[in-house]
Regions:
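Catalytic-core regions of core metabolic enzymes
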Residues: 1-617
Length: 617
């Protein structure tokens, strides 16, 4: 596509371009704007500068005519004969700060707009903001501010540029991309920031009919579980099927066990086949050898199954892509929701439905956790139980062959028992759908992402391809959509539990660590609780005379477990305190073991211990 054609295309979507004029080979050149640049437009000349086919700073029509003649001569001297099919373009030369806007059809997030410093500095500094083509103005602004160069829009050095103009420009790009669905990649570089606003001076666009997105299928409600079948329930205590069957005994609905050997398990009939089940089932858990799963799903369709949890491994994770694809094709054909394969299972607190082979020590609560790693999930469940954190839902997605993160977030948004969502993410199948779900979510979404190194990228013809498919894009897009990215796995259960915390109190035996912790608390938008005169009076009776009478409550370095206990018994009664940190550093007299035992007690307020040291603690 020639520069003239690109300008016409962009102008149709109201994307500003410089004044320009297309000039025929046999046409006398004339322009009513100067200075101009003149370039050849011909498929015969790819690298214009090498052919001497670009002339700059032309200030009159006479000079324009001379420049055209010189370009023709230069090109012909290179052995290329021009004719009436070739054209020229005269473009008004414009000055301004060089910026970059582009679009990539990312394998995960779909069509995504990129913004950064223009010219050759783009790839050098990789200072890039990422913006979804579906983002609203607020999300666009957050995406733009992901690049440091966006400070230009904050009246930098009194230049008077507003970020509103950049947001308007991005919205025009969004409209252009949606109106031209075959656009697969685009570079606008540079886009000049001028007194008149942003102007796209140079553009390259790649088209691909395969870039058109397909619609997602309408699903049944995965969390609507009334009748459950456990395929592979086993009386062998060493098998996964035994653990799942035992965990499922608390379910408030109907649970059926299936095992080809028959018999009984936990006082319930073991049906020899799916066909023997006394009724239809909406949900099936499958824990049998992988070679039997497809035929089992076939049987389950005759029981009108809507949801299938494939616990069994032996698919993509060991290289059997074909076997996994057969599962995908089958469940899509029959509109079955599939979790897995190769997963830990599923839990729903409201109905005491535990279809996992993890611990049965699970408390009902308001946090939903979705994880691609069963091992990480099992560890989080154990840690949560120890800290009395309950779950509304737990979903181990395993290979995530069918239902993905976006669909689960969308479904959890409609679950009243769920108040917050935490995700352990190794990779995403459909980032675009996830962003849509995140925008609509009325519940906070916390994410820990592993595999942060650059992932595989499709070959690209532009700057854009070198800046996509990485953790920075993942982070930029998700944070702009309102998600909270974490740098600690255990924060997936602790951060949501502390979401409503406002006032924090610190009990410590050392000033330095408490000072560091104070900064940490304040930087995260929490308040350090201010002790009242009455609070101080009560603490005075329990602490040495020289305690600082402020929060952090420094109980002095010689504090032992008895002083920690008296202090905690007092501060847990302070009505406005939401959370208590307890800092312990090793002094000669510090009885660390007794203090640790003390901190494990059931206190009225959440207590988070911080043991600073090594061997002695």
């Amino acid at each position: 596509m020639t520069e003239s054609e690109l300008y016409n295309l962009l102008s149709a979507s109201k994307i500003p371009v410089p004044p320009y004029k297309s000039i025929g080979f046999n046409e006398k050149p004339a322009a009513d704007f100067f200075p101009v640049a003149l370039k050849i437009e011909s498929p015969k000349v790819i690298h214009k500068s090498e052919f001497g086919a670009v002339k700059l700073n032309i200030t009159s029509n006479e000079a324009l005519e001379a420049a055209k003649a010189e370009i023709i001569k230069n090109v012909e001297n290179k052995g290329v004969k021009l004719d009436g099919s070739d054209r020229f373009i005269a473009t008004k030369m414009t000055r301004g700060e060089e910026l970059y806007f582009g679009m990539v059809n990312d394998a995960v997030f779909g069509k995504t707009i990129l913004f950064g410093k223009g010219g050759v500095l783009l790839e050098l500094y990789k200072d890039v903001g990422y913006i979804s083509i579906d983002a609203d103005r607020a999300e666009i602004e957050r995406g733009l501010k992901g690049a440091k160069i966006s400070k230009l829009f904050d009246n930098f050095r009194g230049l008077g540029f507003s970020i509103d103009g950049a947001i308007d420009f991005v919205q025009k790009l969004q409209n252009f991309i949606k109106q031209n669905p075959s656009v697969s990649e685009m570079d606008l570089n540079p886009v000049l920031l001028t007194d008149e606003g942003l102007i796209a001076v140079d553009a390259r666009i790649q088209f691909d009919d395969h870039a058109i997105e397909t619609a997602r299928r309408k699903r049944h409600d995965f969390f609507d579980n009334k009748k459950v079948a456990i395929i592979g329930a086993s009386s062998d205590q060493n098998k996964v099927g035994y653990a799942i069957a035992k965990n499922a005994l608390t379910f408030k609905g109907e649970a059926y066990f299936v095992n080809a050997k028959g018999g009984e398990l936990f006082g319930k009939t073991l049906y020899k086949s799916v066909a023997e089940l006394p009724s239809d089932v909406d949900t099936a858990v499958i824990s049998i050898p992988s070679k039997f799963i497809l035929s089992t799903l076939e049987e389950l369709t005759r029981k009108n199954v809507k949801n299938a949890l494939v616990i069994s491994a032996g698919f993509k994770e060991i290289g059997d892509l074909e076997g996994e694809q057969k599962l995908i094709d089958f469940v899509q054909k029959h509109n079955i929701n599939m979790i897995g394969p190769n997963c830990l299972g599923y839990y729903k607190g409201e109905t005491d439905l535990n279809l996992t082979f993890g611990s049965n020590n699970v408390l009902s609560g308001d946090l939903a956790v979705v994880s691609q790693s069963g091992a990480v999930l099992a560890a989080l469940m154990d840690k949560a139980f120890q800290n009395k954190i309950g779950f509304s839902h737990i979903v181990s997605v395993g290979n995530m062959a069918d239902i993905d993160f976006g669909e689960l977030v969308e479904a959890l948004n409609d679950e009243p028992a769920c108040k917050a969502i935490s995700l352990y993410v190794e990779g995403m199948n459909d980032g675009k759908a996830f962003l849509q779900a995140a925008r609509k979510s009325k519940k906070p979404i916390y994410i820990f992402k592993t595999g942060r190194s650059a992932e595989s990228k499709a070959a690209a013809f532009s700057h854009t391809g070198n800046l996509s498919g990485n953790y920075e894009m993942f982070k930029g897009l998700l944070e702009s959509a309102g998600c909270i990215l974490l740098d600690n796995i255990e924060a997936l259960i602790f951060r949501p539990a502390l979401n409503d915390v406002k006032n924090v109190l610190i009990v410590t035996n050392a000033g330095g660590p408490a000072s560091i912790l104070t900064d940490y608390i304040v930087e995260r938008g929490k308040n350090l609780y201010k002790l009242t005169d009455e609070n101080i009076k009560i603490l005075d009776a329990a602490l040495p005379f020289n305690w600082p009478k402020a929060n952090p409550v420094d109980i002095i370095g010689d504090a032992m477990s008895d002083r920690y206990q008296k202090t905690l018994e007092i501060v847990q009664e302070f009505d406005e305190v939401d959370l208590i940190y307890v800092v312990v550093t090793p002094q000669f007299m510090t009885d660390g073991d007794k203090i640790a035992e003390l901190l494990l007690k059931n206190w009225k307020k959440p207590v988070i211990p911080i043991m600073v040291g090594g061997y002695d603690l």
